[in-house]
């Protein structure tokens, strides 16, 4: 089954329009220069900036990934040694 070229063009156009929309200041209400007059908006902007500045720790995901990637090896060992004898 061949994917039509129109679908590719549509996906690219939607992706570009979405990235351009996120780049405008209207999409970011916390980047509004008038927000400094409102203390609640300023506190919200500071909280968002602080949350975006802190990176997510990758350490909790590593043991889970190691476990999931080891499952095919364990399955192979069980089939070779226990099932097929």
Curated annotation (Swiss-Prot):
Expressed by the venom gland. Its main location: secreted. One of its GO terms (molecular function) is sodium channel regulator activity. One of its GO terms (cellular component) is extracellular region. The modification Asparagine amide is found at residue 84. The keyword GTP-binding does not apply. Residues 1-23 form the signal peptide. Belongs to the formicidae venom clade 1 family. This is Myrmicitoxin(1)-Pr2d.
């Amino acid at each position: 089954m061949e994917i039509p070229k129109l679908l590719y063009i549509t996906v690219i156009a939607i992706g570009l329009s979405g990235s351009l929309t996120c780049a405008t200041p209207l999409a970011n209400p916390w980047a509004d220069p008038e927000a400094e007059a409102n203390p609640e908006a300023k506190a919200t902007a500071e909280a968002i900036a602080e949350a975006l500045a802190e990176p997510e720790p990758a350490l909790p995901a590593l043991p889970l990934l190691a476990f999931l990637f080891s499952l095919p090896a364990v399955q192979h060992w069980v089939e070779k040694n226990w099932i097929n004898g």
